[in-house]
Amino acid sequence: VRLLVVLGHQNCGAIKQAVKEYDALLHNLTASAEDSLMAADSVADLDERIMNADSIMLRTVGFSIWQAHESELESNEDFERVHIARTIEQLVEHSESIQQALASDRLMIVGARYQLDSGKVEVLSF
C-alpha cells in the first residue's frame, strides 16, 4: 500500500454525538462550580475527564472536539476536519509499521472529507 486515505464525511453522527456529550460535560463541570475560579479549575483538567469518560464516543472523538475548541473552531465541519487530522496522528503515533513506511517514503497519508450534499471530496492538507 502506497497511499492511505483517512476519509471522514459531512454530517458525521459520531461527531454530532461527541459534541453533545462534550457540551454536557462542560456544562456539568461549570454548573457545579461555585465560582469562576472553581469553574476554571474544573475545565483545566478537561482532557483527563474526556480520557476517563464512561462514554466511548467521548473518549474516542471528544479529544477532537476539545482540540477544535482550543483552536477556537466551532462548526461541525471544522470538528470533522480536526477529527480526520487527529485520526491520522493516532495512526502514525500507534503504528510502528506506518512510521517506518512514512520515514522511508513508501507511504503517503492523505486526509479527506466527503461532502454528502455535493458528492465532492475535500482533500485536507496538514
Label the predicted regions.
Residues 6:
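Conserved functional hotspot residues or short segments at active or partner-binding sites
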Residues 9:
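Histidine-centered divalent metal-coordination motifs
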Residues 1-3, 12-126:
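Divalent-metal-activated hydrolytic enzyme cores
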